[in-house]
Amino acid sequence: MEYMSTGSDEKEEIDLLIKHLNVSEVIDIMENLYASEEPGVYEPSLMTMYPDSNQNEERSESLLRSGQEVPWLSSVRYGTVEDLLAFANHVSNMTKHFYGRRPQECGILLNMVISPQNGRYQIDSDVLLVPWKLTYRNIGSGFVPRGAFGKVYLAQDMKTKKRMACKLIPIDQFKPSDVEIQACFRHENIAELYGAVLWGDTVHLFMEAGEGGSVLEKLESCGPMREFEIIWVTKHILKGLDFLHSKKVIHHDIKPSNIVFMSTKAVLVDFGLSVKMTEDVYLPKDLRGTEIYMSPEVILCRGHSTKADIYSLGATLIHMQTGTPPWVKRYPRSAYPSYLYIIHKQAPPLEDIAGDCSPGMRELIEAALERNPNHRPKAADLLKHEALNPPREDQPRCQSLDSALFERKRLLSRKELQLPENIADSSCTGSTEESEVLRRQRSLYIDLGALAGYFNIVRGPPTLEYG
């Protein structure tokens, strides 16, 4: 079978349709189809992790109607991956029976960092949930990161004192795909899933906490990332992708908000759109992902492979180095509600690569954004690219946030010593632009220093400064 082709007649019809549509018509169509601006829309996963779901659904419905308790839904307890997948399938299939009918919480836990008490795991008494505070922003900002159809909270088990991320998904939007990949595949660059608990009408997913926030949050608060920071993040994500792709898993939503900083690494999160391929080419029934990072072959819906993640990573690299996603500077969202047609006709967005990008990094990005997926490198190939393996003398001295903060303080002290007396004196009143910048930088150092000291968090990516 020709790659990316499901039949010559169908191909000719689609090409003919696209050829005769003008941009305004396409925009109107896409705006109606994708009225919601929430990225990463959930659709049922096509991977079958629990083949007897129909039989189990009938059995569960029968038990619920008879007033008997379903074993998976009677309490919060430790279990196997198979138990968790069975629980997820039952919750997803029996949504209509749960509204107002759950006297207490129930769930399956995979890790003993979560400590239930007598089959219960109650909010406030057993686990504390607080809105996630972005470490790069003012503590009072009240920022709560969002994933597809879910909020993320910081959770702490009251007995083990383990801090975790807790993603809340309304039960009517919960799908088994939300837990399948993380439960079945373990890797250091994939956020570990600790368990799932159903409280009332909301499923709570507990996983490794990325207390350093996401790449998107860092970009929004600190601006474009430096190249050695990008190298650090990219190597971690490519390791995760190499593992997933070796298992024939497509993540389908690689983007800055789904890359999270742990204490010493970067990890991938949000696997709700992921699928496990059963053949060399995945033939989708729907669009999966966030369109601004989508590859051309995903948009055409004629079939794609794990190479789609590589293209999305290339688009993410542009976002990291410029602080702006590809396409949006040249095609503002206000004028172009959808980028699907633009990506189909004009990809790859090589014009959006940063002007100060090194030759090696530019070569890597161009390779990742190769329009033909057959010519696009694998994750393992990109890991060997010279852009990600610079000479030792070119690597930064700072390998942690602590050392970066120390370096920042040293640089600030040096700048203050070099300032003329009249400017140094005016820094308290902010009478000059330079002194105002210095004052903000000092404030940033104090805020980050306090956070690092109190929470003992984030030791990556390596950077000379976070400002």
UniProtKB/Swiss-Prot annotation:
Matching Gene3D superfamilies: Phosphorylase Kinase, domain 1, Transferase(Phosphotransferase) domain 1
Catalytic residues, chain numbering: 253 (proton acceptor)
Sequence ranges assigned to domain Protein kinase in this UniProt record: 138-388
A biological-process GO annotation: immune system process
Domain of life, per lineage: Eukaryota
Cross-referenced InterPro entries: Kinase-like_dom_sf (IPR011009), MAP_kinase_kinase_kinase (IPR050538), MAPKKK8 (IPR017424), Prot_kinase_dom (IPR000719), Ser/Thr_kinase_AS (IPR008271)
One term of GO molecular function: ATP binding
Reported phenotype of the disruption mutant: Mutant mice develop normally and show histologically normal bone marrow, thymus, spleen and lymph nodes. Mice are resistant to the induction of endotoxin shock due to defect in the induction of Tnf in response to LPS. Mice display impaired host defense against T.gondii with reduced parasite clearance and decreased Ifng production. Mice also show increased susceptibility to M.tuberculosis and L.monocytogenes infection.
Factors inducing expression: Up-regulated by Il12 in T-lymphocytes. Up-regulated during in vitro adipocyte differentiation. Up-regulated in epididymal adipose tissue of obese mice.
Cofactor(s) it depends on: Mg(2+)
Modified residues (Phosphoserine): 141, 400, 443
Claim: Acetylation is one of the keywords in the record: no
Tissue: Expressed in bone marrow-derived macrophages, peritoneal macrophages, splenocytes and 3T3-L1 fibroblasts and differentiated adipocytes (at protein level). Highly expressed in adult submandibular gland, thymus, spleen and newborn digestive tract.
Compartments where located: Cytoplasm
Name this protein carries in UniProt: Mitogen-activated protein kinase kinase kinase 8
E.C. numbers: 2.7.11.25
Catalysed reactions, as listed in the record: L-seryl-[protein] + ATP = O-phospho-L-seryl-[protein] + ADP + H(+); L-threonyl-[protein] + ATP = O-phospho-L-threonyl-[protein] + ADP + H(+)
Binding site for ATP: 144-152, 167
PTM annotation, UniProt: Autophosphorylated.
GO cellular component: cytosol
Modified residues (Phosphothreonine): 80, 290
Presence of keyword Nucleotide-binding: yes
Keywords for this protein: ATP-binding, Cell cycle, Cytoplasm, Immunity, Kinase, Magnesium, Metal-binding, Nucleotide-binding, Phosphoprotein, Proto-oncogene, Serine/threonine-protein kinase, Transferase
Subunit structure: Forms a ternary complex with NFKB1/p105 and TNIP2. Interacts with NFKB1; the interaction increases the stability of MAP3K8 but inhibits its MEK phosphorylation activity, whereas loss of interaction following LPS stimulation leads to its degradation. Interacts with CD40 and TRAF6; the interaction is required for ERK activation. Interacts with KSR2; the interaction inhibits ERK and NF-kappa-B activation.
